[in-house]
Amino acid sequence: MKQISADNFKKVLNINTIGPALVGKFFLPLLDNKNPSVFGFLSARVGSISDNKLGGWHAYRASKASLNMLIKNFAIELARTNKLAKVIGLHPGTVDTDLSKPFQKNVPDNKLFTPQFSADAMINVVRGLKDGDSGSVFAFDGSKIES
């Protein structure tokens, strides 16, 4: 809690919540309503309130929880005009990037993914979506992440 700062909180919310909200605002209405389509937002498991067992990462967790609510809202609103579109969140897993470097030592060997593995896994999730999945957040392995 000591590390919370207003400036950092605003920065993280701008990147992880407000940016995606504006992307959704302008692009979701453009989805074809005559053919099935999927709009996926990059979310994270740490945005799940019920899955939070460790605390910490206050701004990041709050920004992703907020994004997950937007995903649900967008799915509900889009379904009123486009029954064939799905709006989902995708958790890529822990990907070997600069962002994950500080905590990679705590990640099990088989749970640190290459960007290519993660991208392929998320594409497979999209391919396996079913009716009723819009508004949900899915992990790279296809499991649904609870709110």
What are these regions (language model features)?
Residues N68, L78-V95, D133-V137:
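Conserved Rossmann-fold SDR core element
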Residues R45-G47, G93-T97:
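Short connector loops/turns at beta-strand edges and beta->alpha or beta->beta junctions
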